[in-house]
Amino acid sequence: MKDLDWSNLSFGYMPTDYNVRCCYRNGAWGEIEICSDEYIHMHMAATCLHYGQEAFEGLKAYRCPDGKVRVFRMDENAARLQSTCRGILMPEVPTALFEEMVKKVVRLNQEYIPTYESGATLYIRPLLIGTSPQVGVHPATEYMFLIFVTPVGPYFKGGFSTNPYVIIREYDRSAPLGTGKYKVGGNYAASLYANKMAHDLGYDCEFYLDAKEKKYIDECGAANFFGIKNNTYVTPKSTSILPSITNKSLMQLAEDMGLKVERRQVPEEELATFEEAGACGTAAVISPISKIDDLENKKSYVISKDGKPGPISTQLYNKLRGIQYGTEPDIHNWTTVIIE
């Protein structure tokens, strides 16, 4: 293993030794290439640069206490990328190719997989871009699919602790019938200013309401929202929300624990009724919410009265992390051992 301070990694980019690439030309995917270059040479008129023809994914590799390295639900990442491809007219990356490239890039960079004790992980970033030149709004004819990896610490510096959020109405993450359900860079560009506003106001993250009516809960920054009340796991249903693999997994685990699961429209005022709430996603796993302030209407929805994560959120977090690290039974066959 590399001699790194694994316990003090930030959630940021660190160079590793290799990335893997595969190009799409003449209607077919080519061979997988192993590359040590961190840079891409492409045409200045590439569609990814002008018309937003790019999609990405995020998943992690975990060094486990049994010495094995596992990844979590990479078939779901492949399926979500394929959905994005259909949405913005890019060729779908076959699941077998996606999984082979994930395995290859993790094995090539295994010296960068953090120790189990550090709580850090190897973040895996698949990226698909349109590379052929195009002037005029049309899909590319050539594409590059690449995957790089980088060791990361927790997304939120405080780890599993509560964080304050603020409702931002001046900006929308995505349009009601736009690209919100796809993992494309444009959605994140749309969130940059709102995220800066939230940080400038002293909050960890921005909180979005639906773009059409500003009545219903949408997303927590770059993560899905869930709330717990009356032994029920509640999460918003909307065409503009990215389908979170973490949220999908938490819903299943909540059912396994005997909770009722509701995926539906969640009015803003219902925030006052939740006993627990959190943001969930690959990067953060679960970020419990302490409060959500509505500055415009001078309201504060205090979720955690004692400032600590709630018992059900804690149980869900520990259960999911246990499956990812191989310390809990993987009854749903979510993990894949990449290195024995």
Predicted features and spans:
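Helix-start/capping segments and mature chain N-termini
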Residues: 1-105, 127, 134-340
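Extended, Lys/Arg-enriched charged tracts that mediate electrostatic binding to polyanionic substrates
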Residues: 114-129
